[in-house]
Every structure is written in structure tokens, then in C-alpha cells.
UniProtKB/Swiss-Prot annotation:
Belongs to the bacterial ribosomal protein bL20 family. One of its GO terms (biological process) is translation. InterPro entries: Ribosomal_bL20, RIBOSOMAL_L20_CS, Ribosomal_protein_bL20_C. The gene is rplT. This is Large ribosomal subunit protein bL20.
Amino acid sequence: MARVKRALNAQKKRRTVLKASKGYRGQRSRLYRKAKEQQLHSLTYAYRDRKARKGDFRKLWITRINAAARLNGITYNRLIQGLKAAGVEVDRKNLAEIAVSDAAAFAALAEVAKAALPADVNAPSGEAA
């Protein structure tokens, strides 16, 4: 028989892969080759979704800001344009938090944004000009 020089290392490697694949369905948690393939895919998905999470949160913040802005009679893009024109530097994360937790403060910010916009921008569509 051939001599196996790396038996302990191979066993340890297989054991760590199978330990990491605990909780996968079927053969993917029991067979080394399937577990190794699934682990590679899982790590790829985790990397991809860590990047995607940032965009997902930004979408959520924008949705919340838009909903609160419309309650105050202004759209999201006009709110952001007005805040920039007024020199108010609040990022979307904090603006969404204010919109959810403190409606009065958000209403005040909406009024500041409305005041900073040109007069014809505040008119409903169809009446401008």
C-alpha cells in the first residue's frame, strides 16, 4: 500500500468543511465534495449580498423619505433639491430616521425645503408658467 503522509491534515480539512456546512440540506451537509461546493457558493453569495445590502438600505431610506415628504405636500426629489438649496446637509439615513421618529421635525425640514425652492417649482404640475 502507498504511504499517506497527510492523513491528519486531510481529515482536519474535511472536518472543518463539514462543520461549516452544518445546516445545509441533504448531501450538502454530509458529503465532503458537495459540502465544499456549497460552501464556495455560500461565501460568494455572502460577499455579493454584503455589497447589495448597502443599496437596499438606501432604497428603503428613499421610500420612507418620499412617503413622509408626500404627507407634507412635497415630493422626494423636490425635498432633496430644496434642502440642498437651503444648505441643509442631512444624509438620507438620518432624514429617514427623522421621518419615522419625529414627524414635527421632518415637517419643519420640509417647510425649509419648500421655502428654498423657486416659486414656480412649488406650483402643482399644469399651473406653472
